[in-house]
A protein has these predicted regions:
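Bacterial Sec-dependent N-terminal signal peptides
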Residues: 1-25
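Aromatic-lined, polymer-binding surfaces characteristic
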Residues: 75, 86-89, 103-255, 261-269, ...
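Non-catalytic carbohydrate-binding regions of carbohydrate-active enzymes
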Residues: 263, 267-361, 390-394
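Low-complexity, Ser/Thr/Pro/Gly-enriched N-terminal "stalk/linker" regions
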Residues: 23-78, 84, 88, 108-115
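Long, charge-dense tracts
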Residues: 98-99
Length: 415
């Protein structure tokens, strides 16, 4: 009897240890979490579009205040925005890991989808020739080529490439609004320039000089003549400004655009670094972000500038790899961990955290929401990059609210 009791006690004592070992074995790494969510987000779009079935199978959701424009803009928004976020990940070399197999599959679907997008005879030919809105999402497609030039642009056949050049060129018919839209023209023309096609340098240079004029200080640009407090500095302005500058100044080798001073590539990166510091400090200890400004349904797209800094190895000294990864993972898990942001067909649903169509703007459909993919740019870093391998660290607000030492904040001024 005593022997049985001792055995029972031993089993009870060992159970927690075995449970902890099992938990450790099944606990996913931050990168695995990101890959899983990105794959889930991308698969319904690319799998369907690669077969010419996106328009047929996408469960489309429109804002209750939809302004009546052609709802087929949905498909271009969905594809373009997704690819702008996905391009760096798909640019990694193939390998035989579980992630590598998924990545190779997504790239295959993506390359087929790119062909569908510009083939007038294809069922998923996108809405290139109608609606001024087309300029916006053509710019995200162009941005995906800038971000994944060798992996996504170069493998396309010559007919498909020429079709893209033709479609991008005819978008000069669109007169961009006096706002962040100037960067959409600049991005399209910057890609044409990089691809060796005829480009309109004035559309690039005039847009960049205007954005430069709209810099208001401390890492913030005004979205047009009047400042608005929203996330458009992350959705559009910092990333597209830097990427267009990178093309036209040859990554800072040229100090001027034409005969005009200003628009300094390296200074633009420093401003983005300051904005990245601000974004990191906005992430709460619980992994939430403040909900303010228009287009809040773009969810994690608000983190794009921070994601860009991490992917390009431009994080400022104030931010470590471990704290940025931990902070971004906390937001991504909080936003997508329970699946509530996907509809019954697997596409993103209108809302911020769940189905909340009432908060969407008059121009918003659920294709618009694939801006969320822009937070996943660091997946373009290999799995052994320090961003992924450095030890996880508490981010600024978590340290502050837990009573730990944390760095003071300082405004940024050009030196």
């Amino acid at each position: 009897m005593k022997k049985q009791n001792w055995l029972l006690l031993l089993v009870i004592l060992l159970l927690p240890a075995e449970s902890m070992i099992a938990k450790k074995k099944t606990e996913k790494s931050d990168r695995e979490i990101w890959c899983e969510i990105m794959y889930r987000m991308a698969t319904p779009v690319l799998k369907n579009m690669s077969d010419g079935l996106l328009k047929q199978n996408m469960l489309v959701e429109l804002s209750p205040t939809w302004d009546g424009r052609n709802k087929e803009v949905t498909y271009m928004e969905c594809f373009g925005r997704l690819m702008a976020g996905l391009a760096p990940w798909l640019s990694l070399p193939d390998d035989d890991t579980a992630e590598g197999i998924q990545r190779e599959q997504l790239r295959e679907w993506a390359l087929n989808s790119y062909k569908q997008a510009v083939d007038p005879a294809a069922p998923d030919y996108l809405l290139w020739r109608q609606e001024g809105r087309t300029l916006v999402d053509a710019a995200y497609i162009a941005e995906s080529f800038l971000r994944g030039y060798d992996a996504l642009w170069m493998p396309l056949d010559s007919v498909t490439k020429q079709r893209y050049i033709n479609e991008f060129t005819q978008l000069r018919r669109v007169d961009p609004s006096y706002s962040n839209w100037l960067l959409f023209s600049a991005t399209v023309e910057s890609f044409l320039r990089k691809a060796g096609a005829p480009s309109d340098t004035y559309r690039i240079s005039s847009s960049l000089r205007k954005i430069e004029e709209w810099y208001v200080g401390d890492g913030w640009y005004s979205d047009g003549p009047r400042f608005a407090f929203d996330y458009y500095n992350s959705f559009v302005i910092h990333p597209m400004y830097i990427e267009a500058l990178e093309v036209i100044t040859e990554a800072g080798k040229r100090e001027k655009i034409g005969n005009m001073p200003g628009c300094n590539y390296h200074e633009a990166i420093r401003r983005a670094q300051r904005f990245g510091v601000i974004l990191e400090r906005l992430i709460s200890p619980e992994g939430t972000l403040p909900v303010f400004g228009r287009s809040i349904t773009y969810r994690t797209g608000s983190l794009q500038t921070l994601a860009l800094l991490a992917w390009r190895n431009w994080l400022p000294v104030e931010l470590s790899n471990g704290q940025v990864r931990a902070a971004m993972t906390a937001v991504i898990r909080r936003m997508f961990g329970d699946g509530r942001n996907f509809n019954t067909a697997g596409f993103l649903t209108l809302g911020f955290n769940g189905s909340q169509p009432g908060i969407s703007d008059y121009y918003t459909n659920n294709g618009s929401l694939y801006m969320a993919s822009l937070a996943f740019l660091p997946l373009g870093l290999s799995a052994d990059d320090p961003f992924w391998t450095d030890a996880s660290q508490s981010w600024t607000s978590k340290k502050a609210w837990e009573g730990e030492e944390f760095p003071k904040d300082h405004s940024y001024h050009k030196k």
